Structure formats: structure tokens, C-alpha cells
């Protein structure tokens, strides 16, 4: 089985170049209005578990299927901020989100980003 991971995030253990960590450390230089599918690492792990115990042999999107803007992601995590908005980024699609139909048919139900933040 092949797995296509979308924007994986976690409160701890993220790399230096990941947006969540840059926001926490104050090293992010700008934000965009691009929409991305933010999937929590716990949901990714449960998706992998579902897939390794299944007979599925294709490629699977591992994401919530819900797109939230980079700006909304930042504001939900650190509150309103003064970072500049970069309106256009070359080679970046405006919206990028998973189509998790295969995993949902297996009973996988990830928590959308904003719901995950509000539950913390």
C-alpha cells in the first residue's frame, strides 16, 4: 500500500522547518492564505494501523479531507499575530486536501484540525 501524507503536525517533536515549530519558536517569517489539510500525527498513526491490517493494495490519501488556511492554522495555535501575509507563492496550489474515502470506508475518522486544537 502507498500512503500520501498531507500536512502532518504535532505539538511535540516536529522538525525545525515545520510551521508548527516555527510558530512556537517565533521563527516564521510570513503566512499565506493557502489552504492545506492539517492532519495530526495521532490520526496518521491510526491510519497506518488501519492500512497495515487491511488487504488494500492501492495508494491512499492520509488527511482529514478538510482544508484550513495557513493563516487560520497559525491564529488557532498562537492567536492573532503580526506576521506579514504573502499573497502569492510560486508553484503552490491554493487548496491542497486529501480525499480520504478509502480510509473512511475502513472506519477511520480523523479529527479536523480546528476541533483538535479546541480539545487541547
What do these predicted regions represent?
Residues 13, 17, 36-42, 65-68, ...:
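Residue-level signal for the nucleotide or nucleotide-sugar donor/cofactor binding architecture
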Residues 52-56:
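Short, hydrophobic alpha-helical segments
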Residues 6-7, 59-62:
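Short-chain dehydrogenase/reductase
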Residues 77, 113-120:
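Amphipathic terminal alpha-helices
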